[in-house]
């Protein structure tokens, strides 16, 4: 002990004379902790389960809507002959107000000039393009109607078609598939309409 009566090392308490911790109190604290933790985990799992159920219901509704839209589009006669032009999407960054306006005007003029020669070109040897292929034409029609592109891409993947061709309607049909697959695609369309 120092001159003030404080211990130099340790607490200065003789641990052999200290009474034991009450076991009932310790058990009560542990039980309370376990009960509160379990209640929290139960509430958390209930909230997660409700959110997953809501999400699953929304996915089912979207899938049903997509199937109905697919059936409606497949029931439209003459949809095989539909062709359309897709204008390229121009992305410009806004750095200066006048610079971005000038760039957008130039890009619009360039796209108008580019579209002229494309229309006058004739596909050599009557190659079937994606826009004229009946399997891809209905997906292009879905894009025009306003169906989300990701849903259309997923549908194309599920049917074994290349979703990248959705953005390139002037590209030739892969593997030279043409009129012989028209009958197969109409059979597959009727299998989706419930």
UniProtKB/Swiss-Prot annotation:
Could you describe the subunit structure of this protein? Component of the WASH core complex also described as WASH regulatory complex (SHRC) composed of WASHC1, WASHC2, WASHC3, WASHC4 and WASHC5. The WASH core complex associates via WASHC2 with the F-actin-capping protein dimer (formed by CAPZA1, CAPZA2 or CAPZA3 and CAPZB) in a transient or substoichiometric manner which was initially described as WASH complex.
Q: Which parts of this chain are annotated as the region Disordered?
A: 98-125, 158-194
What Gene Ontology cellular-component terms does the record carry? early endosome; WASH complex
Give the coiled coil ranges. 46-74
Indicate, by first and last residue, each region the UniProt record lists as having compositional bias (Polar residues).
98-123
Instruction: Check the record and name the InterPro entries matching this protein.
Output: WASHC3
Q: Tell me which species this is from.
A: Bos taurus
Q: Which family does the UniProt entry place this protein in?
A: Belongs to the CCDC53 family.
Query: Where does this one sit in the cell?
Result: Early endosome
Chief localisation class: other
Source species, domain of life: Eukaryota
> What are the N-acetylmethionine sites (modified residues) in this protein?
1
Specify the protein name: WASH complex subunit 3
The alphabetized list of GO BP terms reads: actin filament polymerization; exocytosis; protein transport
What keywords appear on the UniProt entry? Acetylation, Coiled coil, Endosome, Protein transport, Transport
| Role this protein plays | Acts as a component of the WASH core complex that functions as a nucleation-promoting factor (NPF) at the surface of endosomes, where it recruits and activates the Arp2/3 complex to induce actin polymerization, playing a key role in the fission of tubules that serve as transport intermediates during endosome sorting.
Q: Entry's Pfam families?
A: CCDC53
């Amino acid at each position: 002990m120092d001159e003030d009566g404080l211990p130099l090392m340790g607490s200065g308490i003789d641990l052999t004379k200290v009474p034991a911790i009450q076991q009932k109190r310790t058990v009560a604290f542990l039980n309370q902790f376990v009960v509160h933790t379990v209640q929290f985990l139960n509430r958390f799992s209930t909230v997660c389960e409700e959110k997953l159920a809501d999400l699953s219901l929304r996915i089912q509704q979207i899938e049903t809507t997509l199937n109905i839209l697919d059936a409606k589009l497949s029931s439209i006669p003459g949809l095989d002959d539909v062709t359309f032009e897709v204008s390229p999407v121009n992305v410009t960054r806004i750095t200066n107000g006048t610079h971005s306006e000038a760039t957008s005007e130039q890009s619009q003029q360039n796209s108008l000039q580019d579209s002229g020669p494309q229309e006058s070109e004739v596909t050599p040897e009557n190659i079937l393009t994606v826009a004229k292929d009946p399997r891809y034409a209905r997906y292009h029609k879905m894009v025009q109607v306003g169906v989300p592109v990701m849903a259309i891409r997923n549908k194309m993947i599920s049917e074994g078609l290349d979703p990248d061709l959705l953005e390139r309607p002037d590209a030739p049909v892969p593997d030279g598939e043409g009129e012989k697959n028209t009958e197969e695609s109409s059979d597959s369309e009727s299998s989706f309409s419930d």
